[in-house]
UniProtKB/Swiss-Prot annotation:
Stored Pfam families: PNP_phzG_C, PNPOx_N
Pathway terms, separated by semicolons: Cofactor metabolism; pyridoxal 5'-phosphate salvage; pyridoxal 5'-phosphate from pyridoxamine 5'-phosphate: step 1/1; Cofactor metabolism; pyridoxal 5'-phosphate salvage; pyridoxal 5'-phosphate from pyridoxine 5'-phosphate: step 1/1
Cofactor: FMN
The protein's assembly and partners: Homodimer.
Domain of life: Eukaryota
InterPro entries the record matches: Pyridox_Oxase (IPR000659), Pyridox_Oxase_CS (IPR019740), Pyridox_Oxase_N (IPR011576), Pyridoxamine_oxidase_dimer_C (IPR019576), Split_barrel_FMN-bd (IPR012349)
Annotated positions binding pyridoxal 5'-phosphate: 20-23, 79, 137, 141, 145, 208-210
EC primary class: oxidoreductase
GO process annotations (BP): pyridoxamine metabolic process; pyridoxine biosynthetic process
Keyword Oxidoreductase: yes
Keyword match Flavoprotein: yes
Organism listed in the record: Schizosaccharomyces pombe (strain 972 / ATCC 24843) (Fission yeast)
Protein name per its UniProtKB record: Probable pyridoxamine 5'-phosphate oxidase
Length: 231
């Protein structure tokens, strides 16, 4: 028998699992009657307090464009949590996520806090923040970050980094460097809130028998139902 030399079947990565999850466990009785957003805040604070987690606010935002159904994901930063949901800020004009959300208002978030062996998944509907809410946050950004929001046509093709740096310099000249002179919010930039239909809390368990509990509802007007999911 001749040796198969087809490189398309060659393993580029082979990662047999050796890592065991043994930190903690989740029990239904401890979750019953809890507001999942309050529970998320509790987990987030524990992640923030863990010295091994440098950026607990990092989360993977996934969106899908219709009618193709093509999915795209990217790391973003959670900036706020309120009684309705999870808030991030972004370019809402040229970015891929903005184009996806124009055709499909559903999105998901995934938080992974490895030292705690915890994951939180969020599925929900996007709603845009008001101009006033966006302006309130925009003022907290460093001045150069505010200028960067104007300068970057996010996700558009550019020739090279020099083109981007040239745009930054142009907007620096336009707005000046006097901190007392505000940099306005671009019309194409703003905040979005992911209002949850489902929030899943995942705690790693021995032998991959993880604890998974989902707070879920079919519409935003309903109360959440708590269910356990098989790992």
């Amino acid at each position: 028998m001749s040796e198969n030399t087809d490189s398309t079947h060659e393993k580029l990565i082979f990662a047999p699992s050796r890592y065991q999850y043994e930190k903690s466990s989740l029990h239904r009785d401890a979750l019953m009657g809890k507001d999942p957003l309050v529970l998320f805040n509790q987990w987030f604070q524990e992640a923030t307090d863990d010295e091994g987690i440098k950026s607990p606010e990092s989360t993977t935002l996934s969106t899908a464009r219709l009618p193709s159904g093509r999915v795209s994901s990217r790391l973003v930063l959670l900036k706020e949590l309120d009684h309705r949901g999870f808030i991030i800020f972004t370019n809402l004009g040229t970015s891929k996520k903005a184009k996806d959300l124009k055709s499909n208002p559903y999105a998901s978030l995934s938080f992974w806090w490895e030292p705690l062996q915890r994951q939180v998944r969020v599925e929900g509907i996007i709603e845009r923040l008001s101009r006033e809410e966006t302006e309130e946050y925009f003022k907290t950004r460093p001045r150069n970050s505010r200028i960067g929001a104007w300068a970057s046509p996010q996700s558009e093709v550019i020739a090279d980094r020099e083109e981007l740096e040239k745009r930054v310099e142009e907007y620096k000249k336009k707005f000046g460097e006097d901190e007392s002179v505000p940099v306005p919010v671009p019309d194409f930039w703003g905040g979005i809130r992911i209002v949850p239909l489902e929030i899943e809390f995942w705690q790693g368990g021995k032998y991959r028998l993880h604890d998974r509990f989902s707070f879920r509802r079919n519409t935003l007007d309903e109360d959440y139902e708590l269910v356990r999911l098989a790992p």
